[in-house]
Amino acid sequence: MLRLRNPENNPAGIQMRLGFEGFMQYRSEEHKDWTIHDIVLHKEDTDGNRRMLDAFFKEHPQAVLGAVFNSRVYQVANYLHEKGQKLAGLVGYDLLHKNTEFLKTGEVTFLIGQRPGLQGYCGVKTLCNHVVFKRPVTAVKYMPIDILMKENIDFYFEFE
């Protein structure tokens, strides 16, 4: 399995790390036989990313699954599309237009929608409760996610 992640100093790193830890817990309970390989892609270095992916797939031609723990699953899907390759499963985050297009073509298997509007609303509400109403704030607020696939992506946007 290929795992793509941000450099550690990225501001989204904490949320991504927590998502990865949950994924690894699931893997340890359900799929102990999976081998995980890390690759760090850089947002602005398309050529470097291509070289890293070339080297990875040359060294690990048996890789069949991929998980991208940030919003750039489209980079991997585009790379695979250009190479005429496809993974048995490729999962990513966020409903960027590029990501949803690759989801619709089947080159991305699942996208995890994190409901950013709801997250923003809850953040402002919590801030208001704390600052204006002097109410205590919880350190962690669990939020719902949506698991989307090509069969339900069009319906999802109808109800936003």
Model feature map: region roles:
Residues A88-G89, F110-P116:
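Short, glycine/charged-rich beta-strand-loop motifs at protein surfaces that mediate ligand recognition
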